[in-house]
Regions:
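Short beta-strand-to-loop acidic/aromatic patch adjacent to the donor-nucleotide binding site
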Residues: 71-89
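A conserved hydrophobic helix/loop-capping motif in glycosyltransferases and polysaccharide synthases
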Residues: 9-17
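Aromatic-glycine-rich donor-binding/catalytic loop that engages nucleotide-sugar donors
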Residues: 119-137, 146-157
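A recurrent flexible, glycine/aromatic-enriched loop bordering the glycosyltransferase active site
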Residues: 103-119, 126, 135
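Active-site-proximal specificity loops/subdomain of glycosyltransferases
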Residues: 22, 34-76
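C-terminal catalytic/acceptor-binding lobe
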Residues: 24, 141-217, 221-291
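Short, well-formed alpha-helical segments that are part of the catalytic scaffolds
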Residues: 17-32
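Conserved donor-nucleotide/metal-binding helix-loop-beta segment in metal-dependent transferases, i.e.
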Residues: 88-111
Length: 291
């Protein structure tokens, strides 16, 4: 059987966000209902270990997995990097497909390439991907810098800023674990831990199945509003689309997070990063930093 090459692939990084993943999966079936199911695939890039979440690396590993799966075609496939808590509110809001030389930015901040954006696999590889920052912050800022450095066009003709009603954004906790080194490294353009610095990578790709317990509950009352809502949701659940989980079982980067110093910051009240505030041993242990 011939391998069907998708036109675009969603790469959705996450760790410990099962509810958001379920919401994303079900709602995207509605959003993508008018698309040919062979045109796109969704990959949830899942960091399974207890180390701080490395959002840049999970995105990079999503790319590596696609390069390995489609070695002859990945450069021309559109990659849609999409946060797990962010998705369009309405069908056909975005035309995801792009071409070499153009990056489409759909949602986020103008000063960073985060939220939702599209880039070809070839352009992403040329930019050396995201920095593999352990903890939270600045990988999206660095990605925009790299795109501009390589003289790629950033197309914001379909762009919606943060808090736009055209995009659903399920906010997570504002508490962030941030490396003391990242703000200084960003200012000095000194992010050297990138796509080409991921080692000892081990991952598996599994089919993703969205379940809905209400569908099989014999106690459901068909005249009950809650039951009817659950059944409506289940109609979406039964729609088939190509969804997979990249379970990242092991990887190393140039920077070892066990050797980093982190601090915890509430980014709702203090939006500017505040380095040189040190984490205590209790918090480090809680974040999996005590090896």
């Amino acid at each position: 059987m011939d391998l069907i090459i998708p036109k675009f692939i969603f790469i959705v990084p996450y760790r410990n966000r099962e509810k958001e993943k379920t919401h994303f999966s079900i709602y995207m079936k509605y959003i993508m209902e008018d698309h040919d199911k062979n045109d796109y695939e969704i990959y949830y890039s899942h960091q399974t270990d207890l180390r701080p979440f490395n959002r840049g690396a999970t995105k990079n590993i999503g790319f590596i997995a696609m390069k390995n799966k489609y070695p002859d075609h990945y450069k021309n496939i559109t990659l849609v990097f999409n946060d797990i808590d962010t998705l369009p509110a309405f069908k056909n809001t975005f035309n995801y497909i792009t071409s070499s030389g153009t990056v489409k930015h759909f949602y986020g901040f103008h000063f960073a390439l985060g939220g939702i954006f599209s880039i070809t696999g070839g352009d992403f590889e040329q930019c050396n991907g995201f920095p593999n920052n352990w903890g939270w912050g600045l990988e999206d800022n660095a990605m925009l810098d790299r795109v501009l450095l390589h003289e790629l066009n950033v197309d914001r003709n379909q762009f919606h800023p943060i808090n736009s009603k055209q995009v659903i954004h399920l906010y997570d906790t504002p508490q962030r674990l941030v490396s003391n080194n990242d703000p200084g490294n960003y200012i000095k353009k000194n992010f050297i831990d990138n796509l080409d610095k991921i080692y000892e990578l081990n991952y598996t790709i599994a089919n993703h199945i969205t379940s809905n317990d209400a569908h099989n509950d014999p106690h459901n009352d068909p005249h009950n509003d809650a039951t009817n809502h659950a059944n409506d949701t289940n109609k979406l659940t039964l729609i088939h689309q190509k969804e997979y989980i990249i379970n990242i079982e092991h990887f190393r980067t140039l920077v070892n997070p066990a050797n980093e110093i982190f601090y915890n910051q509430n980014t709702f009240y203090a939006k500017k990063l505040l380095p040189n505030v040190y984490e205590n041993s209790v918090r480090r242990s809680r974040w999996g930093l005590k090896f």
